[in-house]
Amino acid sequence: HKSLPDAQVYAPLAHPIETLRLLLTKTPLEHEAIMALRGLANGPVDAQVHAHMAKIFRDPELRPRANQSFHDGHRHTYQRLQHLMRQLPEGIHGFAQPQLLMAVASHAAINDPSLFMGCVIQQGLCIGTLLAFEQDHPHSAQWRHQLETGARLGVYALTEIGRSNSHMGACVEAVFDPQTRTFVLNTPNKAALKFANVGINNLDKMGVVFAQVTVQGQACGVFAFVLPLSDAKGPRPGVCMSSPAEIRAVPLDYGLASFDRVRLPFDAWLCDGASIDAANHFHDPLGSTDRRLIRSLFAPKNVWAMVGIGLSSVMLACATLALTHANRRTTQARIGNGTGLLAFRTQRRALFGCLATAYVMKCFANDSARLWIEGTASQASLQTTGSGDVTWTPWAAISQTLALTKALCAPAAEALATECRLRCGVAGALNLNRFADYEGMAK
């Protein structure tokens, strides 16, 4: 329509990655419709927080490098993660201002999916686990501070390679030794190898390792243990860490870890109200191994909120890139020489459909993030643990809404990024424009 203003160019293809962030920070304020859309994009995060986070992510130290080997790329990702942890405002520590974590998720996802996954593991999983279980624990707050400042890197070791749904019953054992009141952490077979970000094994990494606690021959449930996995000299005694597997979708140093009768002090156990008395009797106030499993897997709800925000931000970025490209580009086809691509119905239907999907998923992810933000104040309470039985997986018992957010956002983001990439022709295939990276992030 002739009365419509010219399309605002947010992020032309082949421009530096920071132009994508203009979607969140530089929309034209004079148009009420644009303001409304900006509010939808910001979601539960204040515009000032987005602006501050955009400034942090403009730091050249956080930019990914091109044409690196897998090993060099993994190391650079961790360097950037540690640099980012040092730059973040104090309010993110202990999730005191939970909207800051959502802002990190949004900007990290657009900046680089590998850095985003590093943030998910470091903040959502490892810091989130320590925060949830640090009440009355002598060292948990100290460990959390080391991760929050980037002094150490977190490894979340839950998945075991040999079985589907391995989180339902960890085979790695933490056997209580009544003589020394310590635990012996052991990987019984190759099926119990942990699959986690352990491939670069000469960095200072701290593991949050999930194991079946066994007391006097009785399986007492899955709990988290915290232990040093590696330092500059390599893996710690009794810890074996494989070289990284090459996963092109989202490059990170995923590999296999095992434990050969590693002796852990009693305080390595994030007991979370459970206890072993002087007579070596195990007690758990939750009363069942199913409830304990749900409780131990508390931190993934942080990840689902982060992933929902991250993927929905990526969807908006993809739609913006593709529409900007189509709006600026003409065709020399005989059917319409000099005609803009958006004049063709097939292009409009595809790209406006992508834009609509992006906004719908963004609204859904924002609502889920609001629920997560509202729930952070009570997240450490034992009373918030679900009481239902675990059947297929424990995720629905942890949070139905947040689990659904991840389940819906991931395939939507993959399909949308693929469609936008195809609609941009050769420009969509350029690594600089990140469509393939965003597809991989959603897989």
Indicate residue ranges for each PLM-predicted region.
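Intrinsically disordered, low-complexity regions flanking or connecting the multi-pass transmembrane cores
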Residues: 14, 18, 215-218, 310-314
